[in-house]
């Protein structure tokens, strides 16, 4: 017996593997710029015969240029972030959102829930001779509205209850 020799190729047509498609072909990277449609092929002679039998040139096809975005154009937008202001029973220094000036707020006192609860409590305790209306004279029991001294806009309210 003879020793087995080197491997030999199988008989028949040899198949050479082809390379896979490129990334651009697979994903379509250039999909941002659509390719114009291919022109329709004309007759092989290059001349088209008209209704009167005379030869005419084939129509020419024009493609529109693809717009290229300007890489140098940068839009700059300034954003101002204003911190939320906490309103209490004292004036607040702030920038007015209406007139855009730096101001110290003016205060206005109004009867709120704490004022009415105090009045009702005093009435139940027996202060019916007008003493139950004392909370309407005490600023510490009323709600506080903050106004801009320039444009008189209401900026915020401090509610005690």
Curated annotation (Swiss-Prot):
Subcellular location: Cytoplasm; Nucleus; Lysosome membrane; Early endosome membrane
Region feature (Membrane-binding amphipathic helix): 111-134
Topology term for the membrane: Peripheral membrane protein
Disruption phenotype: No visible phenotype. Mice are born at the expected Mendelian rate and are fertile. Mutant mice display altered responses to nerve crush injury, with higher numbers of macrophages in injured nerves five days after nerve crush injury, but at later time points macrophage numbers in injured nerves are normal. Bone marrow-derived macrophages from mutant mice display increased migration in response to CCL3, but not in the absence of CCL3. Mutant mice show dramatically increased survival in response to a dose of lipopolysaccharide (LPS) that causes rapid death of 40% of wild-type mice.
UniProt superkingdom: Eukaryota
Induction of its expression: Up-regulated in macrophages exposed to lipopolysaccharide (LPS) (at protein level). By estrogen and lipopolysaccharides (LPS).
Protein known as: Lipopolysaccharide-induced tumor necrosis factor-alpha factor homolog
Organism from which the protein derives: Mus musculus (Mouse)
């Amino acid at each position: 017996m003879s020793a087995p020799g080197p491997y030999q190729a199988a008989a028949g047509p040899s198949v050479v593997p082809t390379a896979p498609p490129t990334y651009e072909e697979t994903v379509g990277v250039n999909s941002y710029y659509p390719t114009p449609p291919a022109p329709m092929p004309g007759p092989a002679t290059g001349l088209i015969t008209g209704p009167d039998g005379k030869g005419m040139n084939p129509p020419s096809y024009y493609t529109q240029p693809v717009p290229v975005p300007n890489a140098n154009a940068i839009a700059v937008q300034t954003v101002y972030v204003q911190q939320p202001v906490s309103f209490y029973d004292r004036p607040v220094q702030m920038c007015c959102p209406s007139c855009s000036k730096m101001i110290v707020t003016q205060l206005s006192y109004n009867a709120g829930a704490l004022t009415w609860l105090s009045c009702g409590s005093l009435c139940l305790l027996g202060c019916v001779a007008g003493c139950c209306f004392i909370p309407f004279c005490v600023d510490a029991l009323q709600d506080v509205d903050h106004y801009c001294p320039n444009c008189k806009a209401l900026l915020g309210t401090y509610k005690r209850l």
